Amino acid sequence: MSRTSSAPSQKSLISRALKAERDVITASSQSQALDAAIDAAEHYMKALALTSSSKDRNVLDAKCKEWLTRAEKIKGSEDWRSVAQSRRSRLRTPASTRKLTTREDIILLQGAKLNGFIFPPWKAEPSLTEFETGTNGDVLFTDKPDLHLSNLQRDIFAGWKRPHELLSGQVDDAGMPLNPVMTVSGNTDLVQDVLTDCSVVASLCATTSRSERGLDDTLLPIVYPCIHNSMKSDISPSGKYIFRFYFNGCFRKVVIDDRLPSSKTSRSLYMIDRNHRNFMWPALVEKAYLKLRGGYEFPGSNSGTDLWVLTGWIPEQVFLHSDEVTADQIWSDLFKSFHSGDVLLTIGTGKLTEREQKELGLVSEHDYAILDMKELKGRRQFLIKNPWAGTDAVYPALFADPGPFPNSPFLSPGTFWMDCEMVLQNFENLYLNWNPGIFAYQEDIHFTWDLSTGKGMAGCFVKNPQFSVYTERGGVVWLLLGRHLRTIESRASEEDERFGFISIYVFKGGKRVALSDGALHRGPYVDSPNTLMKLDVPPRSTYTAVVSEESLPRVSQNFTISAFSDSPVRISHAPNKYICVTKVQGSWTPTTAGGNAESARYSLNPQFSIVLSDPTDISIVLEPSDQELATHVKLFWSGGKRIARVRSRDIVADSGDYRRGGSLVEKQDLDPGEYTIVVSTFAPDQYGSFTLWVSTNITCEVTQLPSEAAGRRAVLSDIGVLLPGQDRMLAPLTTPRLTRVKLIARSRESRIGNRPVGPSPLLMTVELGQGPYKEILATSEDGDHSDSISGVRVEDFDLQPGLEERGGVWIVLERIGGPGGQVEDHFEVEALGEERVEIGEWIVEDA
């Protein structure tokens, strides 16, 4: 009975304690933080008094002690903010729980093979037996093959040596022999020397500084074996070490031995701690990472990617020179998270000239670690560390004076304070790695994108992987796209890997999209193997995330896309809006590149008939092979026949303005019938191939229509000229045998004097005989005059031979020039017959 009555009160007390914890983090003064910490401890104490569960008692007792200790530290610490904001240093990392498909299992297995080694998915922490020596205790573990060294490194290479060999003969300050250790007390000073892995060293500087600020007593990444009942790394008796790194879609097991490349000179071939020469943890982490990246010849990547692999923390890249980035925004976004230990910060320069490097004291295309952030009296500064051992101790141009921090500890060489505004001015990229534990839920999808079948058009997403993202409660959702690392076959292939770009586009709806137009969010194209999209979405909303690329190697590549959120989130392959998709290929050639609808040759463009038996929604996507071509699509109501001229009443839908990267027509509830699709480039004589995708909700037939001249014999007349005051001319038309004929009259030139003008409205008729008893056999445009830029047409009619006795058959062109007209028109007629026909000379009738 008492348990039932106390439960609500206990729950209420815990809720108040959690609120007090949040108040500690957001406190604006030391006294507010202290009061909130005491409040949290008191509420946990009261909840502890009400519990009867031994498990709950242990948890609540630990929380009481934690917050009492925190309150004492806040009260006695000058840097009370760091203490107050360290609540989230240890959060549970979420994990995807959706069941993988067989194909996804295969993708993860493929990702295990990398650069000649096998890195299986992580299953569990290794047992201590994995690190035991042989029966006699003298068999040390040796990993084969040895990691690759560059030619420069080989010049000073003195062999692979165990830590005790490297430290042989060295003593500490007290004269005692140095023995290798995996943990140290006091601050570290990690640096690179010969190796070009500044990004790796900067990454480890960021993780060690987090521990040194008191946010976590465990170094990241964790190295096994560990000291009993802790996550602190220990010396392996066998020289075997195991790492849990995140890459190629999951956490994986990386195994190395403790042999490191020794040097013939004073230069070091591995990362060192200048404060603790016997601290082997950095060099072993470096070796494990370089193993999966292909060896010690590794040219470097960026520290955001390296930290992602080393820790599994979510990478984000901020372009500091973007117009959207401000010092206020950067500082407000990062300050609290940094001091609570939820984000690791590194930073990189862009390409600098030698003069700029000398004047600024910065290294070109180099990564630095951010060790601390301080704000006092309106001054905001970053503590930055250059991981290169050869750096100078002071940077005259950028070294900030102690200013508001006169009691700052001694800075090691290469470490300096810099104002936030100067950071944005002199660095190019800020790399953030977020603790995934700030989210409660994660869901992953692993997929393959086959880029070997040809490059997709920029802005056309018909072939791109697309995903539906749904959240019931809404709120913050982060989407992380990761490209899987591949084996480096050569330095050239490595360059290909490094210079591809990936991005994420986000649309409403959750269904597949065809073009980039209408995106809610467009991520930047980054040359990293990862990119992050941050969303804030309303409840019960579904979005489409599209994966895009530029210049990736034209091979099949594996990816993982992950969704992170504080509430359950679902991610799946985006369904198509349409049931049936028909793919047709064609091209614009010298005879079919007719240009836009204002061109006289528009009707020559490729045309397609589409037959619909029932009402349906329809999508038509035109994807040219040349991304520089601006294209357009029109859908006509035409009975499925070729379009000879463009009339607005016949247009059902079109793609709008001409655009590069593909064109899209969408129409809802299109009636049954036969329609014609015309695809065009902006200007005539622009050649190239294309793919036409027609998507509907019913089965449909799409066929390319033959050209007007297909199967016909074409004959061109001489050019007939109507001078001012002349409005009618005619030419005889004959055939040796019965045939079907189509006539097309086109303007070749119209002018007033020397000034070009549009053609006069024209009517073309086919007449038997002349004079009062003539007979009209066929006429253009239903008997109306037309100034259509594509010309006027007389559709198919039967032409018989031997009609000369009845006055002959005549092609008659009659224009509306009006009395005193000043226009001079030049016309040409093309006859398309099943048999050859002849067109005689033009006879011009005076007004």
Swiss-Prot record:
Keywords: Hydrolase, Protease, Thiol protease. Required for the proteolytic cleavage of the transcription factor pacC in response to alkaline ambient pH. Probably is the signaling protease that mediates the first proteolytic cleavage within the signaling protease box of pacC, yielding the 53 kDa 'open' conformation intermediate protein, which is committed to further processing. Required for virulence in invasive pulmonary aspergillosis (IPA). GO terms for biological process: cellular response to pH; penicillin biosynthetic process; positive regulation of penicillin biosynthetic process; proteolysis; regulation of secondary metabolite biosynthetic process. PANTHER family: CALPAIN-7. Its EC number is 3.4.22.-. Residues 116-436 form the Calpain catalytic domain. Belongs to the peptidase C2 family. PalB/RIM13 subfamily. Residues 1-84 form the MIT domain. It is an enzyme of class 3 (hydrolase). The keyword Protease applies. The lineage of its organism: Eukaryota, Fungi, Dikarya, Ascomycota, Pezizomycotina. Signal peptide: none annotated. Gene3D superfamilies: 2.60.120.380, Cysteine proteinases, Phosphotransferase system, lactose/cellobiose-type IIA subunit. PROSITE patterns: CALPAIN_CAT (PS50203). SMART domains: calpain_III, CysPc, MIT. Pfam families: Calpain_III, PalB_C, Peptidase_C2. The active site is at C198, H366, N386. GO terms for cellular component: ESCRT III complex. This is Calpain-like protease palB. One of its GO terms (molecular function) is cysteine-type endopeptidase activity.
